[in-house]
Amino acid sequence: MEVTADQPRWVSHHHPAVLNGQHPDTHHPGLGHSYMDPAQYPLPEEVDVLFNIDGQGNHVPSYYGNSVRATVQRYPPTHHGSQVCRPPLLHGSLPWLDGGKALGSHHTASPWNLSPFSKTSIHHGSPGPLSVYPPASSSSLSAGHSSPHLFTFPPTPPKDVSPDPSLSTPGSAGSGRQDEKECIKYQVPLPDSMKLESAHPRGSMATLGGAAASAHHPITTYPPYVPEYSSGLFPPSSLLGGSPTGFGCKSRPKARSSTGRECVNCGATSTPLWRRDGTGHYLCNACGLYHKMNGQNRPLIKPKRRLSAARRAGTSCANCQTTTTTLWRRNANGDPVCNACGLYYKLHNINRPLTMKKEGIQTRNRKMSSKSKKCKKVHDALEDFPKSSSFNPAALSRHMSSLSHISPFSHSSHMLTTPTPMHPPSSLSFGPHHPSSMVTAMG
């Protein structure tokens, strides 16, 4: 069949108004936009010529099979240019579209017939010949392009609107049922999905959130972090700052008192630890330890406290006859000697010569141990810290530098860093960045 003069009206770039469904006479009374009247569909011969003509009008060999031609007879071209496979957009004012049943085989290219398992993109990347509508197995859109939900349901037309019998032919009834079965086969029923959500509400929401994020952004994202504290690993009291019952150590009272218990030796009724003697009687901790170490009962009368070595009246050194010393010692004979003579005899095994006697007592400043010195400096620094007038980073760095020999984090006043994602999605917008991404020690 030769190309007539009226056939270029089916070419997409000559009459975009007709192909886009904008002509006032081509609207179907029962459908939305982008639907043409079936009476204006092209004949099979015209479609054959349409697909066998290249851009310059030359006749080329047939590229598509009979199944594609049969499909084109039921679908009018709806777009101009190379993107002729884009489905028509349904009007937003159709209140009867709900997620109950599938539309039908003649609306296979509608964006409502979605399948979450489809991998076919709606835009072709190759500049070669393009099909008007792909087959039924690849006609559904990807779920990530249209909706972030995992389960989608096609809309249901109202009962009073019946499909036009002219849109479907008797020969295409079998293929229409097959397409409808394929659309329903990949849809998950609602009760199963609700069972999954009701079983684990937090886990299902986290799974849906992760699926939506991976569908919208092709770049790999991190899974959402939803801590599950209801598993019983950590008791609820640990979340509120209290000490867990199974992990914290209870502070024992210093004195245990129980009714009916009394030390048989001293009569005490409260003690840190109750002990027993050989006969099974209760003893307080002091009497029990004394009996264990000495083998006898602890004496109830306290011995008189000895006077300090410097205040012993009438005591003099047997070697140098001094009466003042910091510590009284005894020589081999048992006589009292001063501290200087006693140390000298202990070191040299001879009596200290009298020429070394001095009027005053020589004392030396003992150096503090490194541990006690560090503890003292930390205590002084903590006392001076609240006295600072302002809590700015400069003052904080000065205080941290004073603790440089103590704290392992003293080389910098910033100790905590904020985590940053390795691969941020390209479509996400972030707020203005601060000059420093560190968190100071003040929080």
Curated annotation (Swiss-Prot):
Reading the lineage from the top rank, the first entry is Eukaryota
Keyword match Zinc: yes
- Tell me the PROSITE patterns matching this sequence: GATA_ZN_FINGER_1, GATA_ZN_FINGER_2
Start and end residues, zinc fingers (GATA-type): 263-287, 317-341
Q: Where is this region: Flexible linker?
A: 288-316
Kindly state which keywords UniProt assigns to this record, in alphabetical order: Activator, DNA-binding, Immunity, Innate immunity, Metal-binding, Nucleus, Phosphoprotein, Repeat, Transcription, Transcription regulation, Zinc, Zinc-finger
Tell me which residues bear Phosphoserine: 115, 162
GO biological process entries? anatomical structure formation involved in morphogenesis; aortic valve morphogenesis; canonical Wnt signaling pathway; cardiac right ventricle morphogenesis; cell fate commitment; cell fate determination; ear development; embryonic organ development
Q: Where is this motif: YxKxHxxxRP?
A: 344-353
The record's Gene Ontology cellular component field reads:
chromatin; nucleus
Query: Where is the region Disordered?
Result: 1-30, 128-181, 414-443
Q: SUPFAM superfamilies in the record, alphabetically?
A: Glucocorticoid receptor-like (DNA-binding domain) (SSF57716)
Specify where the region named Interaction with TBX21 lies, as residue ranges: 1-258
Q: Does the keyword Transcription regulation apply?
A: yes
MF terms in GO: cis-regulatory region sequence-specific DNA binding; DNA-binding transcription factor activity; DNA-binding transcription factor activity, RNA polymerase II-specific; DNA-binding transcription repressor activity, RNA polymerase II-specific; E-box binding; RNA polymerase II cis-regulatory region sequence-specific DNA binding; transcription cis-regulatory region binding; zinc ion binding
Q: Where are the transmembrane segments?
A: none
Q: State where composition is biased (Low complexity).
A: 129-149, 414-429
How does the record comment on the protein's domains? Binds DNA via the 2 GATA-type zinc fingers. Each zinc finger may bind either adjacent sites in a palindromic motif, or a different DNA molecule allowing looping and long-range gene regulation.
Q: What task does this protein carry out?
A: Transcriptional activator which binds to the enhancer of the T-cell receptor alpha and delta genes. Binds to the consensus sequence 5'-AGATAG-3'. Required for the T-helper 2 (Th2) differentiation process following immune and inflammatory responses. Positively regulates ASB2 expression. Coordinates macrophage transcriptional activation and UCP2-dependent metabolic reprogramming in response to IL33. Upon tissue injury, acts downstream of IL33 signaling to drive differentiation of inflammation-resolving alternatively activated macrophages.
The record's subunit annotation is:
Interacts with the phosphorylated form of TBX21.
Identify this protein by name. Answer: Trans-acting T-cell-specific transcription factor GATA-3
Tell me the organism.
Answer: Bos taurus (Bovine)
